[in-house]
Amino acid sequence: ITEERLAEIFLELQEKKANNINLVTAGQFVPQVVRALRRAKDGGLGIPVVYNTSSYENVDTIKRLEGLVDIYLPDLKYVDEKLSAKYSHAPDYFVTAQAAIREMVRQTGKPEFAVSGEQRHIFAEEYNDRCDEDAEILMKKGVIVRHLLLPGCADDSRRVIAYLLDTYGEEIYISIMNQFTPLKGLSSFPELNRKISDEEYEQIIDFAIERGISNAFIQEGGTAEESFIPQFDLEGV
């Protein structure tokens, strides 16, 4: 699609009452996305823009998004370069992701939320106290770093969480995910041909709590299903 059409889609989604514009794995299209976002914002786009990424991105790419993206959803998949080389062919993953996430946090600052019916924004501490309320509370600005547990990689998951807590504390949210879904084609990695057990997940959550985590999202059972994998079928384009 053209940049002009992409800008139109952003505005159409806003008209349909979307809560945000979610750009998923858009790194290879950032120049076009930047121009489309500017066009859409000039045309009245006001809902938050979310950038959803593996974090294996050049810092200069992230810098081009400053002022256009409100919420970053980066992964932090690994610390261990042997794991990132084995499963993602990227021995430099952690170093690259480190720098990219640092830039994202610099741009957004601490997380902010909007509460339906209230004029002011609230911050993490108040959100954590109120997140069980019936009122709709939506993030408007900030970074949520996601970490997906992999079978047999609990030690690296602990290293990921420890790094994020030591580096950012309450400046970010951490989403600890148990939704790894083994699919066909894993014959080269038989150790990954299973789901994360409840015990494995609970051990990592306990570790995060022991390390003092307060800004976190966790998952309950039933998430490791193919239904959670989007259908990229061009609907709406």
Label every PLM stretch briefly.
Residues I1, Q28, S88-T96, G152, ...:
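Alpha-helix N-cap and loop-to-helix initiation/capping positions
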Residues I1-I71, D80-E81, Q119-E125:
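Conserved Radical SAM active-site core
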Residues L6, V33, A97, I101, ...:
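Aromatic/hydrophobic pocket-lining residues that form the small-molecule binding cavity
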Residues N22-A26, V50-S54, D75, I144-L148, ...:
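A cross-family glycoside hydrolase active-site/sugar-binding cleft signature
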Residues V30, S55-N58, L76-F94, V143-I144, ...:
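Conserved radical SAM core fold
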Residues E66-D80, Y173-F180:
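Non-cysteine beta-strand/loop elements that form the S-adenosyl-L-methionine
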Residues A90-G109:
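Glycine-rich S-adenosyl-L-methionine
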Residues E112-V237:
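Auxiliary Fe-S-binding modules of radical SAM enzymes
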